[in-house]
Regions:
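Conserved catalytic alpha/beta core of Sir2/sirtuin-type deacylases, generalized to analogous enzyme cores
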Residues: 7-10, 21, 41, 120-121
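Amphipathic alpha-helical interaction surfaces in cytosolic regulatory modules
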Residues: 17-48, 52-102
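Aromatic-anchored, charged helix-turn/loop surface patch used as a conserved interaction hotspot
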Residues: 106-110, 114
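A cross-taxonomic marker for long C-terminal extensions/tails that follow the last structured domain
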Residues: 113-122
Length: 122
């Protein structure tokens, strides 16, 4: 996904450590918490390694919650995420989810229900 040198990493965030006890799935709340931790480092222009080691699968909701919060709430660009975040322990499924989520969250304008109704009526 990116070619960052591992020596440039300032902080390592293990997704596995955020897993709720006794739950197998990662949810949107955990995605938001991880996003806030990543954002702390990105605001300082620090490189972050997000490790998916020991995580066999995550839901698309988890990935979009994490990346959506970084892009929308914290205001980072997709380019900044690509430049400062280094992912490890990815399998093909998680990597595809990250790519789809970044594309979905960064390229589509957010449509409110009022705007949606207006578009349907036209």
């Amino acid at each position: 996904m990116n070619n960052m040198n591992k020596n440039d990493v300032n902080k390592i965030i293990s997704v596995y450590n955020y897993k709720k006890r006794f739950f197998l799935e990662f949810d949107e709340e955990q995605g938001w918490i991880i996003a806030d931790n990543i954002a702390e480092s990105l605001k300082q222009k620090e490189h972050v390694e997000v490790s998916f080691n020991r995580v066999p699968k995550v839901s698309f909701i988890f990935i979009t919650s994490m990346l959506g919060k970084l892009l929308i709430c914290h205001g980072f660009s997709a380019k900044e995420l690509e430049e400062y975040i280094f992912y490890t322990g990815l399998n093909v499924g998680i990597e595809a989810q990250i790519e789809m989520a970044i594309q979905q969250v960064s390229s589509r304008p957010i449509v409110t229900m009022t705007e949606f109704r207006r578009k349907r009526e036209d």
